[in-house]
Amino acid sequence: MTLRAGVLAVQGDVSEHGDAIERAAAAHDRTAEVVEIREAGLVPDCDVLLLPGGESTTISRLIHREGIAEEIESHVEAGKPVLATCAGLIVSATDAQDDRVDTLNVIDVSVERNAFGRQRDSFEAPLDVTGLNESFPAVFIRAPVIDYVGEDVEVLATWDDRPVAVRDGPVVGTSFHPELTEDPRIHDLAFFDSVES
């Protein structure tokens, strides 16, 4: 069975997320059809969604203007999986701590933007992630940090005692960029565990 994976293609590592979902699918003897989402009308036909990084205020403005935001919210309400990374996490949160970001309210967290510093302060760290047998090589680039977690949200990983990966129902959010490694396990955790269970 082919998994139809929509990647929000407004900003961020679109092709890298596509490659990661294809690697994760191959590990399950499946294929993935990657659909780049730039306009409304494509999300309803997707099995899973990826919301990449970029600039959260720009992403928020564009998805609301193009009518994509409502489709993402409906996707989540239908219980379909989403992986939201870095700015995607910020846009998905209930509170972005920035009035310029009109959030989707699909992950019950409050997120502080750029909490781990500027681009020059970017780093890689091995993370212990719930559901993974070995540590994950997480890449943090001007990463946000989660400073409030709702009671129904599962914390999957922390760094420096602060949540950096969470699951809220069908949505997995990460402060880091899992697509910038050759390791597809975060995509696997977000999609195939949910899709096949």
From Swiss-Prot:
Origin species: Haloarcula marismortui (strain ATCC 43049 / DSM 3752 / JCM 8966 / VKM B-1809) (Halobacterium marismortui)
InterPro entries for this protein: Class_I_gatase-like (IPR029062), PdxT/SNO (IPR002161), PdxT/SNO_CS (IPR021196)
Swiss-Prot/TrEMBL catalytic activity: aldehydo-D-ribose 5-phosphate + D-glyceraldehyde 3-phosphate + L-glutamine = pyridoxal 5'-phosphate + L-glutamate + phosphate + 3 H2O + H(+); L-glutamine + H2O = L-glutamate + NH4(+)
Functional description taken from the UniProt entry: Catalyzes the hydrolysis of glutamine to glutamate and ammonia as part of the biosynthesis of pyridoxal 5'-phosphate. The resulting ammonia molecule is channeled to the active site of PdxS.
Enzyme Commission code: 4.3.3.6, 3.5.1.2
Upper classification of the organism: Archaea, Methanobacteriati, Methanobacteriota, Stenosarchaea group, Halobacteria
GO molecular function per UniProt: glutaminase activity; pyridoxal 5'-phosphate synthase (glutamine hydrolysing) activity
Residues that coordinate or bind L-glutamine: G54, E55, S56, R113, I141, R142
Pathway assignment: Cofactor biosynthesis; pyridoxal 5'-phosphate biosynthesis
Descriptive protein name: Pyridoxal 5'-phosphate synthase subunit PdxT
GO cellular component: a single term: glutaminase complex
Catalytic residue positions: C86, H177, E179
Keywords for this protein: Glutamine amidotransferase, Hydrolase, Lyase, Pyridoxal phosphate
Keyword Lyase tagged: yes
Membership in a protein family: Belongs to the glutaminase PdxT/SNO family.
A Pfam family it matches: SNO
GO biological process terms on file: glutamine catabolic process; pyridoxal phosphate biosynthetic process; pyridoxine metabolic process
Quaternary data: In the presence of PdxS, forms a dodecamer of heterodimers. Only shows activity in the heterodimer.
SUPFAM superfamilies for the chain: Class I glutamine amidotransferase-like
